[in-house]
Amino acid sequence: MVSVKVLYKGSGNPVKGAKVSLMFSGLISGGSVPGKYTDYNGEVHFNIGTGNGTIYVNGLDAKTGYISGMEVVHV
């Protein structure tokens, strides 16, 4: 499972209602994961495996690299 926590850069407060989507790279494991919206804690959970890819928040690149566990991104 991969979880993403979205926080505001300035305050560190959670971002509620942000759309988070994932795009994985790789010939076999590549592809996109449908977006989900963060809860009141700024968290969203995907029942998927780990791998190299990009986390998008509201359509903007928030992190590129290996995605696993609980990823914290700032917007």
Segment roles from a protein language model:
Residues 58-60:
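Beta-strand-rich extracellular modules
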Residues 2-10:
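A short, amphipathic beta-strand motif
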Residues 37, 63-66:
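Polar, enzyme-active/binding microenvironments
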Residues 65-75:
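Extracellular beta-sheet/turn segments enriched in Thr/Pro/Gly and aliphatic residues
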Residues 27-43:
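Short, acidic Ser/Thr/Gly-rich low-complexity loop/linker segments typical of extracellular
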Residues 45-54:
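Short Pro-Gly-centered beta-turn/loop motif in secreted/extracellular proteins
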Residues 1-3, 41-45:
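Intrinsic-disorder/low-complexity, polar/charged segments enriched in Ser/Thr/Lys/Arg/Asp/Glu/Gln
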Residues 11-27:
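Short, ordered, surface-exposed loop/turn motifs in non-cytosolic proteins
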